[in-house]
């Protein structure tokens, strides 16, 4: 579904992906029966929208660099901190938020204890800051989340105390498949529009699709899109059938994102001057494609995940 949505609109694809992969999935996987009954019916039906709060000004790729804190005070957790670049920010009703809840010793080193929480939009002390002006996916809301003595019930802890990092990594693994599907959809959409264009556009007395240079570029684009599709589907099957699918998810996300960027760039080039104006979709698709190489872990992070799996 996310792929098909993204063939037409990458923004719609990421709104759905953030909702399902980053909010619904962790609640479904780690939530208590009470939490599932409270949140999932409205989230699954679409009556409410979900989001995921992990990234901070000083903690992007380094998820252990979290500064947002949650302190237990009686029967409530008190949250203080800031999250940035949050997809569906302000528009979402339910947020899965990652925060530091203490310190633990692991392998002889003192590390931050990280936990996950469910936070409703209407909670006092939870506000929204800057709305980002983005290069692409402009139709999606990307906001700063601000927690100032934000009190939530003790039972809003998602999973166990200290499981936040595991929950975040699990969530990102699933999210990467969603972004890979988004990237694949953008690439497919750009390829389809380019094929239509080169059949109609005439130069030197014939359609530009009759020139061998154009044909070879289309062949390369189509081959890479097909290869990306196989990787995305393989990762999706792995998620559905096995516990550990991070390796496949990282490869699918890396390859599909880089293919999307390459295919949309070539699509703009093959459209010539028309590819640079808003009348044609490919300029938007190229801008939308770029973010797929960045969010849910940059291409460099995916290479780190892949190599770590190969060498473990």
Region locations from a protein language model:
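Flexible, small-/acidic-enriched active-site or ligand-binding loops
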Residues: 65, 122-151
């Amino acid at each position: 579904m996310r792929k098909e949505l993204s063939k037409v609109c990458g923004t719609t694809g990421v709104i759905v992906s953030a909702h399902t992969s980053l909010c619904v999935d962790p609640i479904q996987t780690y939530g208590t029966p009470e939490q599932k009954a409270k949140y999932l019916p409205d989230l699954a039906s679409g009556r409410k929208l979900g989001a995921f709060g992990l990234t901070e000004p000083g903690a992007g790729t380094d998820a252990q660099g979290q500064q947002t804190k949650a302190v237990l005070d009686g029967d409530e957790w008190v949250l203080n901190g800031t999250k940035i670049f949050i997809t569906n920010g302000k528009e979402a009703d339910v947020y899965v938020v990652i925060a530091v809840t203490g310190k633990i010793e692991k392998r002889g080193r003192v590390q931050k204890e990280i936990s996950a929480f469910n936070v409703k939009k209407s909670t006092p002390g939870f506000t929204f800051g800057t709305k980002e002006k983005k290069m692409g996916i402009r139709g999606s809301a990307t906001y700063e989340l601000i927690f100032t003595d934000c009190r939530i019930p003790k039972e809003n802890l998602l999973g166990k105390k200290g499981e936040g990092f595991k929950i975040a990594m699990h969530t990102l693994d699933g999210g990467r498949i969603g972004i890979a599907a988004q990237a694949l959809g953008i690439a497919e959409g750009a390829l389809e529009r380019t094929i239509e264009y080169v059949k109609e556009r005439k130069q030197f007395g014939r359609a530009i699709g009759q020139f061998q240079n154009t044909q070879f570029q289309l062949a390369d684009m189509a081959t890479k899109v097909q290869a990306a599709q196989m990787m995305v589907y393989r990762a999706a099957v792995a998620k559905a059938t096995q516990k550990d699918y991070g390796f496949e998810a990282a490869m699918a996300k890396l390859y599909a994102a880089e293919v999307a960027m390459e295919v949309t760039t070539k699509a703009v080039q093959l459209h010539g001057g028309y590819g640079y104006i808003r009348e044609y979709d490919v300029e938007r698709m190229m801008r939308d494609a770029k973010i797929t190489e960045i969010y849910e872990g940059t291409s460099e992070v995916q290479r780190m995940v892949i190599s770590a799996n190969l060498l473990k």
